[in-house]
From Swiss-Prot:
Its main location: cytoplasm. This is COP9 signalosome complex subunit 7. Residues 1-167 form the PCI domain. Residues 233-278 are annotated as: Disordered. The keyword Zinc does not apply.
Length: 278
């Protein structure tokens, strides 16, 4: 046997309720010893692991308060109970055959697997009242081959990891608890949904603020560029005025400087041509 054993099919097989149908049909037309025999056959049948429909048969319900109430209580035990409950009060039930005891142990494993997906060997040994690990592993493997659980045995850590567990019968009155549990789950979902909606509204509001800020910053940049462009244009015009200004304020321009010297080219000759009169 390897240290880790992966067991079970990938998908659960056909519902075990179909195997119970023939016993329900027999119970409808049986009374007395014949009915008790039908119940014992159902308890020993290798493919029957649910008993709710058989318990609901009128002929079976009549056994509850009669001299054969142990058969009813035993059927009730297999539908909802565990092996430890049987061991605690064996006088309440009919004497179980080895096949019946093993089936009740298998059903006990199913009950544990429904509550937790990781089950220590120590808990299984206690619930099944087994003191031998090899015997325990054999019981688990038989339950897996019966297709009521799928899982993996970790022998080093002594843990059964459950991947799938068949459901058991729902006890009378338990439906109300299921409704309450589902309602609590719905309320929790509503609360989470409201919280998510609030977060979405907050995120949208923050997004709107960021868009507004982005538009404002972009507009500020556009305005700043306009101001800078205007200042640059004014500076260029001022520089042009400073460059041409002296020629228009009474000073001599370059063209004038070139022309004026020609009038004073020979001052002496100009003086000779002057006539004086007395």
């Amino acid at each position: 046997m390897t240290q880790d054993m992966l067991l079970g099919n990938e998908e659960p097989s056909k519902s075990k309720e179909t195997f119970l149908e023939k016993f329900c049909v027999l119970a409808k037309s049986s009374t007395g010893a014949a009915l008790l025999d039908v119940i014992r056959q159902a308890l020993e049948a290798p493919n029957v692991f649910v008993f709710g429909e058989l318990l609901a048969e009128p002929s079976v319900l009549q056994l509850k308060d009669g001299p054969d109430s142990k058969h009813f209580e035993t059927l009730n035990l297999f539908a909802y109970g565990t092996y430890k409950e049987y061991r605690a009060q064996p006088e309440k039930f009919i004497e179980l055959t080895p096949a019946m005891q093993k089936k009740l142990q298998h059903l006990t494993i199913v009950s544990l697997a429904i509550k937790a997906k990781s089950i220590p060997y120590a808990l299984l040994l206690s619930e099944l009242e087994i003191d031998n690990v090899r015997h325990l592993e054999d019981i688990i493997i038989e339950a897996i081959y019966a297709d009521i659980i799928h899982g993996k045995l970790f022998q080093n850590t002594r843990i059964l990891e459950v991947d799938y567990a068949q459901g058991r019968d729902i006890p009378p009155g338990y439906t109300g608890q299921i409704v309450e549990t589902l309602q609590a789950w719905v309320n929790s979902c509503d609360s989470v949904s409201n919280c998510i909606e609030m977060q979405i509204k907050y995120a949208n509001a923050e997004k709107s603020k960021r868009l507004i800020n982005k538009e404002r910053v972009e507009q500020d940049l556009i305005n700043l560029k306009k101001v800078l462009k205007s200042q640059t244009s004014d500076s260029d015009e001022s520089m042009q005025i400073d460059t041409h200004g002296p020629g228009t304020s009474g000073g001599l321009g370059q063209s004038e400087l070139r022309k004026k010297p020609s009038k004073l080219r020979n001052p002496r000759s100009a003086a000779v041509g002057l006539k004086f009169s007395k």
